[in-house]
UniProtKB/Swiss-Prot annotation:
Belongs to the transcriptional coactivator PC4 family. It comes from the Eukaryota. Keywords: Activator, DNA-binding, Nucleus, Transcription, Transcription regulation. This is Activated RNA polymerase II transcriptional coactivator p15. General coactivator that functions cooperatively with TAFs and mediates functional interactions between upstream activators and the general transcriptional machinery. May be involved in stabilizing the multiprotein transcription complex. Binds single-stranded DNA. Also binds, in vitro, non-specifically to double-stranded DNA (ds DNA). The keyword Cell membrane does not apply. Its main location: nucleus. Residues 31-44 have a biased composition (Basic and acidic residues). Residues 2-50 are annotated as: Regulatory. The keyword Transcription applies. Disulfide bonds: none annotated. It comes from Gallus gallus (Chicken). It is found in: Nucleus.
Length: 126
């Protein structure tokens, strides 16, 4: 629709006013992301207590298998998952799960455990 307005109005003042409106809209869009950040900072105290409970539960179910690599057992949407995943440190020093990894359901985990000896044999052959 804006294209039709540009075709109808041939005066330069109309296009100038459109560009001013665009600039103002861009400024508003840039300012908008800043507001949620400020709101999150004020509510961190209540969220911080909840996240500390989650992190203590997560720490109990995390088993280190390498540098920044862990096997963890967690509940996701009512389902138990076994994660084998790389982690990274954010700017606050909190560990966050990375993209590299896999989540197994208990059935897949049991199948993997049953095949451990075969996997070990294959590793020895190489």
């Amino acid at each position: 629709m804006p294209k039709s307005k540009e075709l109808v109005s041939s005066s330069s003042s109309a296009s100038d006013s459109d560009s001013e409106v665009d600039k103002k809209a861009k400024r508003k869009k840039q300012a908008a992301p800043e507001k949620p950040v400020k709101k999150q900072k004020t509510g961190e105290s209540s969220k911080g207590a909840a996240s500390s409970k989650q992190s203590s539960n997560r720490d109990e179910n995390m088993f280190q298998i390498g540098k920044m690599r862990y096997v963890s057992v967690r509940d996701f949407k009512g389902k138990v998952l076994i994660d084998i995943r790389e982690y990274w440190m954010d700017q606050e020093g909190e560990m966050k799960p990375g993209r590299k990894g896999i989540s197994l359901n208990p059935e897949q985990w049991n199948q993997l455990k049953e095949q451990i000896s075969d996997i070990d044999d294959a590793v020895r052959k190489l």
